[in-house]
A protein has these predicted regions:
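Acidic-basic catalytic patches of nuclease active cores, encompassing PD-(D/E)XK
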Residues: 2-50, 142-155
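Short, charged/polar surface micro-motifs in flexible loops or helix N-caps
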Residues: 65, 73-76, 106-109
Length: 155
């Protein structure tokens, strides 16, 4: 399964509804000063185990979980961070919920528009897939339209 750029069908009420309720350029950073604080996890090292972070997480009605990790300039997800995020993503996958881990790249030295970062690879149902030429925003819209159909009785 290759994730590739495609035209998002504007008539698709699910995608249209998502786009209307979540404009692409909505600034969600509430306190930039706190964002720039360095978090020191050195006091939480247990042998070779240390904490990792997640750059983004979206929960679409408990039907679709999307984890996002963003890397600079084609850096790869590796080692303990890769293993931890794989395990988290796979553990959240259930019969009624799809869980996806998306790794993106950026070349920015300043502020990063995460939605415009390019998808490098993604993990779905325990398998890694390579991707090219699609932004994170486009990928999320595609996954949403395929996996997060919320039934009326679930509302």
């Amino acid at each position: 399964m290759w994730l590739r750029r495609r035209n998002i069908v504007k008539e698709d009420s699910v995608v249209r509804g998502m786009a209307e309720s979540c404009p692409p350029k909505a600034n969600m950073i509430k306190n930039k000063e706190h964002l720039q604080q360095i978090k020191d996890f050195s006091g939480l090292k247990f042998g070779s185990i240390s904490p990792t972070d997640i750059d983004g997480f979206l929960d679409f009605g408990n039907r679709l979980f999307i984890f996002v990790e963003t890397k600079f300039s084609k850096s790869e997800l590796r080692g303990g961070q890769k293993l931890a995020l794989e395990r988290l993503c796979d553990a959240c996958q259930t019969q009624s919920r799809t869980s996806i881990l998306i790794v993106t790249n950026h070349e920015s030295s300043g502020e990063i528009d995460i939605g415009e970062t390019v998808v490098q690879q993604y993990r779905l149902r325990g398998v890694w897939y390579e991707s090219t030429d699609i932004t994170l925003r486009e990928a999320i819209e595609m996954f949403y339209s395929n996996f997060a159909i919320i039934k009326k009785e679930d509302k």
